[in-house]
């Protein structure tokens, strides 16, 4: 049930957007993706601060590309962002049957074997444009706990969370707020799996500057400490949108050997190398609009200019 406060005029535009997404979700899958590409192309032409952020990130991470090549990549990236928006509608409202039909899940046995140890499993992933739909696909194959950050818009947060909590595979999966470390520990000690994406700029206590594409980046190094505390296995998880409207592929690695390693920084670098390989494989699907290289202090360069605010 939607609380009455969300009927206030300040939410009317949000309701309009939700209505549009509800209509888009009813389209055939190829037409849904085409609607997303169209929305992305419109967004690409708007004077939004995301564009210079994405350009700066591409220049830093992919210096081997020419300016023209990076602009073409930027075009494809905004199409991917638009498709991601429409895929959120599928994540919230589509049936399990539709989701399963469009998806291929690899490595579930790796997760089952990890949980057979009895100490839980941490599923590490990164922010690509299939992040939301990928979590829904993974949950169609295996119950998971998802670490998430609620949207700033309270109405979107209410709708997203209510639908996330409704995904079932025998039982509801749980959502854990991003800063709820105790909630993560409790889930792992119950021998459950916890999915989270600690790849974005992290400037809180415990952050370290760890190279990403060879550039120091504020990084969350808590994963190895969490694994050490709980004894949980750590697995890498990739997700991608296949070309030609072929659906999605998600893949879970075998548990990482020697993890945690000699230091939390080395473990974080290992994860960053995994992300770098994925970025090079499907560059248009990476979340380029995030200010990944914001430093921990003014001692580090400002790569984004006015967009860094």
Where are these regions (language model features)?
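Non-catalytic C-terminal accessory region of glycerolipid acyltransferases
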Residues: 3-8, 37-39, 43, 50, ...
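Catalytic core of membrane glycerolipid acyltransferases/transacylases, capturing the structured
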Residues: 117-178, 190, 201-213, 241
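Residues in well-ordered beta-strands of folded domains
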Residues: 106, 147, 251-253
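Alpha-helical structural context
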Residues: 26, 61-64, 141, 167, ...
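Membrane-anchoring hydrophobic helices of lipid-metabolizing enzymes
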Residues: 1-125, 130, 157-163
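Short amphipathic alpha-helical segments and helix-helix/interface helices
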Residues: 108-112, 135-136, 160-161, 165, ...
């Amino acid at each position: 049930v939607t609380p009455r406060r969300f009927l206030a005029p300040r939410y009317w535009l949000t309701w309009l957007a939700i209505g549009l997404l509800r209509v888009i979700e009813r389209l055939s899958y190829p037409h849904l993706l085409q609607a997303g590409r169209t929305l992305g192309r419109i967004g690409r032409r708007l004077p939004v601060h995301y564009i210079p952020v994405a350009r700066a990130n591409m220049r830093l991470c992919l210096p081997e590309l020419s300016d023209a090549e990076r602009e073409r990549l930027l075009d494809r990236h905004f199409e991917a962002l638009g498709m991601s928006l429409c895929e959120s509608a599928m994540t919230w409202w589509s049936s399990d049957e539709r989701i399963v039909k469009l998806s291929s899940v690899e490595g579930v046995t790796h997760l089952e074997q990890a949980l057979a140890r009895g100490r839980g499993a941490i599923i590490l992933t990164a922010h690509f444009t299939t992040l939301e739909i990928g979590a829904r696909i993974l949950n169609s194959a295996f119950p998971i706990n998802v670490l998430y950050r609620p949207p700033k818009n309270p109405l979107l947060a209410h709708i997203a969370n209510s639908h996330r909590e409704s995904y079932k595979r025998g039982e509801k999966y749980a959502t854990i707020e991003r800063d709820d470390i105790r909630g993560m520990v409790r889930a792992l000690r119950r021998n459950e799996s916890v999915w989270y994406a600690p790849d974005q700029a992290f400037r809180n206590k415990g952050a370290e500057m760890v190279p990403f594409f060879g550039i120091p980046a504020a990084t969350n190094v808590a994963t190895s400490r969490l694994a050490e505390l709980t004894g949980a296995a750590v697995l890498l998880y990739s997700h991608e949108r296949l070309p030609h409207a072929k659906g999605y592929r998600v893949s879970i690695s075998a548990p990482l050997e020697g993890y945690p390693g000699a230091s939390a920084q080395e473990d974080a670098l290992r994860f960053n190398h995994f992300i770098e390989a994925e970025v090079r494989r499907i560059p248009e699907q990476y979340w380029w609009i995030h200010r990944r290289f914001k430093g921990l202090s003014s001692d580090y360069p400002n790569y984004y200019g006015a967009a860094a605010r």
